[in-house]
Structure formats: structure tokens, C-alpha cells
UniProtKB/Swiss-Prot annotation:
Any GO CC annotation of this UniProt entry: exodeoxyribonuclease VII complex
Gene name in the database record: xseB
Name of the protein in its database record: Exodeoxyribonuclease 7 small subunit
Membrane-spanning residues: none
NCBIfam families for the chain: PRK00977.1-4, xseB
Source organism: Coxiella burnetii (strain RSA 493 / Nine Mile phase I)
Annotated localization: Cytoplasm
HAMAP family in alphabetical order: Exonuc_7_S
Domain of life: Bacteria
One GO BP: DNA catabolic process
Length: 82
């Protein structure tokens, strides 16, 4: 189930938890039930992280008005040359 939009979502903490779950699953020491519970939690975390990345991508896009039509243009990071 995708996460509900909330101000309390922490992408980095979710990614760290997902990494820990993967490590547990890779060790192979869990029972089948524990593995399924961890897998289910991991799927939820992946979906939440994907949604957070999608939301961030939308925020980065810049709305430009061209010829009276609104157009979404991807944000391009300026590279700094020293």
C-alpha cells in the first residue's frame, strides 16, 4: 500500500530501514514467516520511497508559460566550473 502524504516521512530513514531489511533477508537466518513479514515491509518502503522521489521530481520541474500554453520543463542543474 502506498504511503499517505505526510510531513513526517523521512526518505533517508526509510532507505536505511530498507537496506537493513535486505541484509536480514540475504543472511537467510529468518523463518519463512519472518521473511514474508520483512519482505512485505520492504515492498511498502520501496513504494513510499518511489512516491517520495516522484514527488521531488515534480517539485523540481519548472512551470514555464510559452505562447500562452503552460509547459513543464525539467529542471537542469547548473554546473559550476572553477
Amino acid at each position: 500500500m502506498p504511503r499517505k502524504k505526510t510531513e513526517n516521512f523521512n526518505f533517508e530513514a526509510s532507505l536505511n530501514e530498507l537496506t537493513a531489511l535486505v541484509e536480514k533477508l540475504e543472511q537467510g537466518d529468518l523463518t519463512l514467516e519472518e521473511s514474508l513479514q520483512n519482505f512485505e515491509r520492504g515492498v511498502g518502503l520501496v513504494r513510499s520511497c518511489q512516491q517520495a522521489l516522484s514527488d521531488a521530481e515534480q517539485k523540481v520541474k519548472v512551470l514555464i508559460n510559452q505562447d500562452g500554453a503552460e509547459t513543464l520543463v525539467p529542471f537542469e542543474l547548473e554546473t559550476k566550473t572553477d
